[in-house]
Amino acid sequence: MKLSAEMKAFEARLGYSFERPELLVRALTHGSISSSTRQDNQRLEFLGDRVLGLVMATALLEADKDATEGQLAPRFNALVRKETCAEVAREADLGAVLKLGRSEMMSGGRRKLALLGDAMEAVIAAVYRDGGFAAAEAVILRLWGARVHQVEADARDAKTALQEWAQARGQTPPRYELVKRSGPDHAPVFTILAELADGRRAEATAGAKRQAEQAAARKLLDSLD
């Protein structure tokens, strides 16, 4: 299989040249374009998530030999979460070569966080299957770059941080309420309210409930004394 000029340019951005280019094509093929043949990237995404986790766990252990499991876990989560994968995908301009069905393309799929994050994990798996663990590790460390060393020791997801803040002050856990759902079925938008027992609250909107909850929790955290 011969790759298009756009795909070759993406290979260059990855810093890896495929011996089996069909793996890269599959990694960049979303289910909206291939549901009948199952030649999409879902299985590769599953594998890539595990490869990414192993590489990041190893990198963190080597970067800080004195860190405890409790210190490493939140850093690890910050590096492998979908938002970070999507951020890396955007930097590599993965959206430009993502193969989507017409409806997904029309709804802005090339910019969707979930699709970009999933495709980035699938690309990692494609590199792993094509060139082995060392090749995948090299690509991951190149793309994630300084994030491995810059991720803060107290990095943790916003919902966990907000719950810890509440518990430290004797409050019950924060509650999250779906305020509004809008948009078409293929591209829903959720507005979530995060509220503390003392009445302080914040709202946020995102394309997935979990992301909206995290954004609302972060917004509320940022407003606290």
UniProtKB/Swiss-Prot annotation:
Domain named DRBM is located at: 157-225
Q: Which Gene3D superfamilies match?
A: 3.30.160.20, Ribonuclease III domain
Per the record, the GO terms for biological process are: mRNA processing; regulation of gene expression; rRNA processing; tRNA processing
InterPro entries found in the cross-reference section? dsRBD_dom, RNase_III, RNase_III_dom, RNase_III_sf
Q: What is this enzyme's catalytic activity, as reactions?
A: Endonucleolytic cleavage to 5'-phosphomonoester
Give the quaternary structure: Homodimer.
Primary role:
Digests double-stranded RNA. Involved in the processing of primary rRNA transcript to yield the immediate precursors to the large and small rRNAs (23S and 16S). Processes some mRNAs, and tRNAs when they are encoded in the rRNA operon. Processes pre-crRNA and tracrRNA of type II CRISPR loci if present in the organism.
Q: What is this protein called?
A: Ribonuclease 3
What organism is this sequence from?
Ruegeria pomeroyi (strain ATCC 700808 / DSM 15171 / DSS-3)
